[in-house]
């Protein structure tokens, strides 16, 4: 059973679905690398969880803006140059996800929380972890090897939520890569240097 100090800083990650009819996953990462995970459907449920844990920031796995022109944002093009596959917010099924994420960010920011756009698949690429569609088992084991302690689960959405929380941790510990573009897109990935920082925490 995982136990946590109420005085530790927390970092909140969200693997958001496009519709509240489907479950979404969240993860709360503590400074000692223990992690609490769970599911929600409606935005107000997530807002309650965020207020319960009062995180340093919230990372949402979804676009938080639309392209100003064309099909892709400039940050998606930058990711492709890094060899990271990413979808346009205008891709089928992504538009409703993006609208939901933008609304959720607004609700959280009104309550004083910092919200950042993150991309678990990109962070997994940066850290040498397989994506969930390649091997959920290897992704699970890879996150555990980094020192993260979370309830045993091979659920792909939960693993992405844990990766999202880890990306927020990296952002606050200044072990991150910012993909920023003139069209207003700001997307955060964990830097490969995060591995060394995590080893120091593991001791």
Q: Predicted regions span which residues?
A:
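Phosphate- and other anionic-substrate recognition elements at nucleic-acid/protein interfaces
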Residues: 2-203
């Amino acid at each position: 059973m995982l136990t946590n100090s109420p005085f530790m800083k927390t970092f909140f990650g969200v693997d958001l679905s496009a519709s509240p009819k489907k479950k979404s996953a969240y993860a709360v990462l503590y400074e000692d690398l223990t992690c609490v995970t769970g599911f929600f459907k409606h935005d107000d449920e997530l807002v309650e969880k965020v207020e319960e844990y009062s995180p340093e920031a919230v990372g949402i796995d979804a676009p938080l803006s639309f392209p100003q022109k064309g099909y892709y944002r400039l940050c998606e093009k930058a990711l492709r140059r890094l060899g990271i596959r990413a979808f346009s917010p205008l891709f089928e099924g992504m538009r409703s996800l993006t609208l939901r994420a933008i609304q959720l960010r607004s609700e959280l920011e009104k309550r004083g929380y910092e919200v950042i756009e993150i991309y678990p698949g990109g962070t997994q690429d940066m850290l040498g972890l397989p994506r969930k569609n390649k091997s959920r088992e290897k992704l699970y084991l890879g996150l555990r090897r980094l020192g993260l302690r979370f309830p045993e689960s091979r659920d792909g959405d939960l693993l992405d939520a844990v990766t999202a929380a880890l990306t927020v941790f990296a952002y606050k510990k200044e072990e991150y890569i910012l993909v920023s573009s003139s069209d207003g897109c700001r997307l955060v990935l964990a830097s490969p240097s995060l591995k060394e920082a995590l080893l120091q925490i593991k001791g």
